[in-house]
């Protein structure tokens, strides 16, 4: 039956890459450099995937609805930043949390909490591992709460289900890269990916096809047939290739047949399905408010305002939107709110108006600014519910209890014909990061090139 389908393919390339996020672009670049014909298919009308830089003309800075920070010394990413002739700017270092009704330095408690997360071991729920660690120890209540707050917010994980071993591996890898040193890319993350795309198109003009929704990947050893349609529903010509690099997010890989964005593989990939089921795409919700002025710094100078000078991050454990950050060192009236894990799921279930209200309530509690003042100062907003996005279905991969080793399975080539990339396939502790995604794209391209060269030698 599969052989019958090849006759109707009207378009042929060496390799088809599914997904034009960081992993897909990195893979396409490597393949194009090797002088292979490449087709890069992207369901969205833009590149970037979970990198979603917006540059609204009436906002004072570029804004990120997706990935935003360069975490520590990520060599692969920083090399690409330099190649694109961009710069990274450290964020505001001051991190405060609401404690006993006032904003206080969170650093001492946060350092202790993060150190504890870095020692997590065992394929048991994070909550269980933390409780075992804390049993008999005199740990301040704030530090105990911050450990859980950090895992749920930063890793988008449910502490009752996520594997302590997996979270510990991620945190130890982050610390090795000085991941607590956050910076932004001047002009936005998208600039790096645009530079990669220009490299692809220089070697493979016309490789990128946007608004192209892949619906089916039929494969046999050494051959792939891809079916796709436009976002409007219009069926596109079938595409035949010698190999495919699949870079769709874990959430899309897990999507049930018939769901928006889901891709059918024929024959089915049973090992991939089982491995994907052992992980989840952690929920994330991100919102940005543009205020007429930086209200947290305005008004008559007081000791309170002095504490907020140079503010980078503010935390409200227990709040509906518990994490906020400024654009420091750039001064503006823009605040970004972030919720991960169960809190993101709660926000996702609410109407937009109620979500906005919950977010403003959180800011009122944090800064003591009356709700009416916040509403009067609010000029614009942007929000993105990543779990409701059919081409993401969440923020980034979280390994559940019983899922250790799943990423290794997801990264494994199939019949030297299907190759997989994306942050969920990372096995070096860099899952959930742009640099991890870039590195997996490069790895999948190397694997694909090696397989194609071996085929050529075997003829």
Task: Set out the residue ranges of the language-model regions.
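FAD-dinucleotide binding site
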Residues: 1-459
């Amino acid at each position: 039956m599969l052989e019958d389908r090849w006759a109707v393919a009207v378009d042929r390339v060496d390799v088809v890459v599914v997904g034009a996020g960081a992993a897909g672009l990195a893979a396409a670049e490597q393949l194009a450099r090797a002088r292979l014909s490449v087709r890069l298919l992207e369901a969205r009308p833009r590149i970037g995937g979970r990198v979603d830089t917006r540059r609204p003309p009436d906002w004072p800075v570029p804004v990120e609805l997706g990935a935003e920070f360069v975490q520590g010394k990520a060599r692969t990413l920083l090399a690409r930043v330099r190649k694109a002739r961009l710069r990274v700017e450290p964020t505001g270092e001051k991190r405060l949390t609401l404690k006993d009704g006032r904003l206080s330095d969170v650093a001492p408690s946060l350092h202790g909490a993060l150190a504890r997360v870095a020692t997590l071991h065992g394929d048991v729920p994070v909550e269980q591992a933390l409780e075992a660690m804390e049993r008999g120890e005199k740990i301040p209540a704030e530090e105990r709460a911050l450990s859980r707050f950090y895992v749920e917010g930063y890793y988008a994980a449910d502490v009752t289900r996520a594997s302590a071993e997996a979270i510990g591996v991620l945190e130890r890898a982050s610390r090795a890269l000085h991941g607590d040193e956050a910076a932004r890319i001047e002009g936005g993350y998208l600039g790096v990916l645009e530079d990669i795309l220009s490299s692809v198109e220089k070697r493979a003009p016309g490789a990128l096809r946007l608004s192209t929704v892949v619906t089916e990947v039929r494969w046999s050893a050494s051959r792939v047939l891809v079916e796709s349609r436009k976002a409007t529903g219009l069926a596109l010509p079938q595409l035949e290739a010698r190999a495919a690099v699949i870079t769709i997010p874990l959430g899309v890989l897990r999507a049930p047949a018939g769901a928006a964005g889901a891709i059918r593989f024929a024959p089915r990939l049973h090992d991939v399905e089982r491995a994907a089921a052992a992980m989840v795409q952690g929920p994330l919700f991100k919102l940005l408010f543009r205020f007429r002025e930086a209200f947290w710094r305005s008004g008559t100078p007081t000791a309170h305002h002095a504490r907020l000078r140079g503010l980078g991050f503010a935390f409200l454990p227990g709040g509906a939107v518990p994490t906020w950050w400024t654009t420091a060192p750039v001064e503006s009236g823009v605040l970004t709110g972030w919720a991960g894990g169960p809190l993101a799921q709660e926000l996702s279930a609410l109407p937009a108006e109620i979500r906005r209200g919950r977010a403003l309530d959180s800011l009122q509690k944090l800064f003591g600014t009356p709700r009416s003042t916040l509403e009067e100062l609010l000029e614009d907003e942007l929000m993105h519910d990543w779990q409701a996005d059919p081409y993401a279905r969440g923020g980034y991969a979280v390994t559940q209890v019983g899922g250790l080793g799943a990423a290794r399975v997801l990264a494994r080539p199939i019949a030297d014909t299907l190759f997989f990339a994306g942050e969920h396939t990372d096995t070096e502790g860099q899952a959930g990061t742009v640099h991890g995604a870039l590195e997996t794209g490069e790895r999948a391209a190397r694997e694909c090139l090696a397989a194609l060269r071996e085929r050529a030698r075997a003829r």
